[in-house]
Amino acid sequence: ANPRQVRDMFRLLQSELGSGVTMTAHFHDTRGMGLANMEAALDAGIRSFDACLAGLGGCPWAPGATGNMVMEDGVFMAEAMGLRTGIDLDALCGIRELIETNLPDARLSGAIAKAGVPKGYAPATQFAVAAE
């Protein structure tokens, strides 16, 4: 899916189902669209997301597919946009290091792991985003 499709679909679902239904978005990052699709879902009002530490996983029906959207990257993006997740990004990155140590052959992904958290980064203090 691309961001326009995601935004349109969630807006349609919300108009049909009403505001009493909580929806969760589930994106893979196989073609680099995970964070862009998350932003589109946020724009459509979605506040709950599936994600996976270090992007672990994949899809048995799609050879070469990556795992779910990288949790560390999603948390960083949400917090950088002013959305409070309640997740300690430093602790999350520490858990990722444990995964790297204990699963040396695992195919891991994620921009925050490669580039690090920018200097001066501070977690958001505004709206809450549900962490699943």
Identify the function of each model-found stretch.
Residues 1-132:
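Catalytic cores and adjacent flexible loops of soluble metabolic enzymes
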